[in-house]
Design a protein with these regions (language model features):
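Positively charged n-region of N-terminal signal peptides that target proteins for export
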Residues: 1-4
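Contiguous segments within soluble domain cores/interaction surfaces
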Residues: 20-30, 43-123, 135-148, 154
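Residue-level recognition of secondary-structure-to-loop junctions
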Residues: 128-129
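Extracellular interdomain linker/stem segments of modular secreted and single-pass surface proteins
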Residues: 156-158
Length: 158
C-alpha cells in the first residue's frame, strides 16, 4: 500500500512540474521607497493560492510598478501569447474575485512570442487619483495551456 502511494506521488510530480510554464515577478514601489513583491500564482482556486501583499500610499502618489514574465517551459516557445496588466478599484483587501474591469485606473497589454527561458516585461507609473482599495494585477493570456498565471498586489490608498 505504501509503495503504491509513493509510486502514485512520483507519477504525479512530473506532470505538476510540466504544468508550470510562466514565472511572473511583480514589484510595486511607493514614493517613500516602500516596495512589495508578488510572484506567479494561478486560478483555481479563485484568487489564487497565495495571499496578496499590500502596499500603502496616499491619493495623488505615483506608484511605480514593474513586472517580468519568464517562459520557464523548457520545451516550447509561447506563440501569440499575451500579457495584460491593470489597476482597478476593489471592495476590500485580499478580495478573492477580480472586480469588474470597469473604470480602470491603468491598463495595458501586449502580444508576444517567447522562446524558452526568454523574458518580457515593462516598467510603468500610475498616479492613484482617489483614496480606496485597488488591485494591481498582471496576468498571462492565450498561453495555450490548461491554466493562466497571474501576480497581484493590493494597494491601500489613503
Amino acid at each position: 500500500m505504501r509503495r503504491a502511494a509513493c509510486s502514485l506521488l512520483l507519477a504525479l510530480l512530473p506532470s505538476a512540474a510540466r504544468a508550470e510554464h510562466f514565472d511572473i515577478k511583480l514589484t510595486a514601489t511607493a514614493p517613500d521607497g516602500t516596495s512589495k513583491e508578488a510572484f506567479a500564482d494561478q486560478t483555481p482556486p479563485i484568487g489564487g493560492l497565495n495571499p496578496r501583499p499590500v502596499l500603502h500610499a496616499k491619493a495623488g502618489d505615483a506608484i511605480a510598478f514593474q513586472f517580468i514574465m519568464t517562459n520557464v517551459y523548457a520545451h516550447e516557445s509561447a506563440r501569440n501569447a499575451g500579457i495584460r496588466f491593470y489597476v482597478v478599484r476593489q471592495q476590500q483587501l485580499g478580495q478573492k474575485a477580480v472586480p469588474p474591469l470597469e473604470n480602470l485606473v491603468a491598463e495595458g497589454s501586449f502580444t508576444f512570442n517567447l522562446k524558452p527561458k526568454a523574458k518580457i516585461g515593462t516598467k510603468e507609473r500610475v498616479v492613484m487619483p482617489q483614496p480606496g482599495i485597488y488591485l494591481l494585477r498582471v496576468e498571462s493570456q492565450r498561453t495555450q495551456r490548461d491554466h493562466e498565471h497571474f501576480a497581484a498586489i493590493d494597494l491601500e490608498i489613503q
